[in-house]
Amino acid sequence: DSMCRTIMSAGSRRGAMMATMRCDHPDIEDFITAKSDAARLRMFNVSVLITDAFMEAVKSDGQHDLVFDGQTYKTVSARGLWDKIMQSTYDYAEPGVIFIDRINRANNLGYCETIAATNPCGEQPLPPYGACLLGSVNLARLVENSFDDAAQLDAGALADLVGTAVRMMDNVVDASNFPLEAQAQEARAKRRIGLGVTGLADALLMVGQRYGSDEAVKQTEDWQHQVARAAYLASVQLAKEKGAFPLFEAEPFLASGAMEKMDSDVRDAIRKDGIRNALLTSIAPTGTISLYAGNVSSGIEPVFAYAYTRKVLQKDGSRSEEEVVDYAVQMWRDKFGDTELPDYFVNAQTLAPADHVKMQAAAQNWIDSSISKTINCPEDISFQEFKDVYLQAYELGCKGCTTYRPNAVTGSVLSVSETSDEAPESDQGADVIYMSEPLDRPAALDGNTYKLRWPDSEHAIYLTVNDVVINGHRRPFEVFINSKNMEHYAWTVALTRMISAVFRRGGDVSFVVEELKAVFDPRGGAWIK
C-alpha cells in the first residue's frame, strides 16, 4: 500500500492495486473487513473470488469449508459468509465480487493458464505477469440519422473501425517496453488485447432507446456481437499475415466457453488459419477517454449527468467555468434547440439496479475478458434488495459485480445537485459551490488523548482526537494539540482547526493521514500514523 502511494500520473492520480482472495481461504473473514478502517489499504481495491460451489451452497443454505493446502481449517455457513461479504459491501462499497469459476471456464486460454485475479477495475482477468492493453470504439460517433425513425448504427463503419483498432493494438504488443522480462514474454506469447466500447448509453439515446429497457438490452447484445465478430475476423487475418500467437492450439482454444457460442464461420476460420490474439474484447471504464471524445457516456455505463459545470484552467493560470454537456444532449440541442428531452433520457440516479445488471449481462455475452461496470444503488436500498442485485448478476452470467451505495461512511464519488424552481435567498457569492454541509457537533464526544515526544522539545505534546458515531460507525470529528512548548503555537492551532473542518465535512477523510505522512521536520520527526 505504501509502495503504491509513490506512484503518480498526470500530476495527481495515484497508482491502484488489486487484492483478491478465494471464498474458501481460511483468512477470508478477516479479508472481507480489511477496508472497514478507512485509513487502511487506501491504494487497494479488494475482491472476493466466488466459486460456483459456494454459490450453490448459498442457495441451499449449506455448509462451506475453509481450506488451505489440503487442510480444512474451519467449516462455516455459506449463507452466513455471503451475508458478511454483502454487509461489508453495503456499508463500505468493498469487497467486490468476482465469479472466478465462470471466468476460468470461459477463458480462451484455459488450457494453458489459470486466472486468480483481475486488474483493479475488473475488466481484465490476468495470469501472473499479465498486462492490460485496452482500447475503445466510440459507438456514439457511428450513429446515423440520430433521433430519427431511421436512426441506426453504421454496421459497416463499425466493422472497419474494429479491424483497424485490432491491428493497431496488436502492433502495440510488439512496440511496448515492459518493466519486467516476464511481462514481455507473457504478452508476446498470448498477445491478449482488450478492445471495448464507449458511448453506449449515448448511442442508445440517439436511436431512441431507454438504457435498461428490453429493447436496449437486445440492442446492446447485438452491437457487442458485431464488435466481437469483427475483432475475431480481424485477428484471423493478422494470423494469416504474421502468424498465430505462439501458444495457440486450435481445438482446446475453440472448446472454451467463450468460443463455443461464436459464429460458426468465425470458428472455422480460426481452425483453418489460427488467430493472432488469444483474447480480444474487454470493456474498461473509459472516464478520461470519454471526455476527449466529446463527453460521451463512459464505457457501457448510463449517463451520470446530462450537464454540469467544470472549472477549466486557462493559459494565463486563471480558471473559467464552462458548461459540460453530454454528447447525446448536445446532438439533441443541435437538432431541436431547447425542445424538452424525451422521457427515455434516463440517468444513473433514476435507473433501478436491475436495469444496470441486465445491461452488464447483455454486454458480457460477447466479451471474452470482462467488464468494468458500477451498479449504482440508492442510499435507502434495503439490505435484502442489495443482496438480490448480486444474485441477479450471478444468475444472468456476469463475471463480477461491483456496486456503489452512497452513505455517510463512504461519501459520494460524484453527485448531482437537486434543482428547484425558486432559488433560496443567500448572501453567499454565486460562485461558491458547497460540496457538503458540515456535520453538527454533539454536546459531548468520545475521544482519546495521546502523549507524544517531538525531537528537540523538552515538553511533551498531547494529541486529542474526538470521534462521532454516524449510522453505527465511528469516525474522527475534531483534533487538538496542546503543549507547554509555545513554539509555532499559532501554526499548530491553525492546522488542527483546518483538519477538524475537513473531518466535519464527512465522507472519506483518510486522505488527511496520507498527506500529513509526507511532511517531515528537517530537525527530525514527522507526522505518522
Language-model segments: what does each one mean?
Residues 12, 69-71, 161-184, 188, ...:
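Internal maturation/activation junctions in enzymes
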Residues 14-19, 207-213, 372-373, 397-410, ...:
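Glycine-rich phosphate/pyrophosphate-binding loops
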Residues 1-10, 28, 47-57, 88, ...:
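Structured alpha-helical segments in the cores of large, soluble enzyme domains
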Residues 1-155, 178-185, 231-240:
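Active-site cavity-forming subdomains of large catalytic enzyme subunits
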Residues 123-125, 169-174, 256-260, 269-276, ...:
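Catalytic alpha/beta core of large soluble enzyme barrels
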Residues 261-272, 415-464:
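Short, Gly/Pro- and small/polar-rich lid/capping loops
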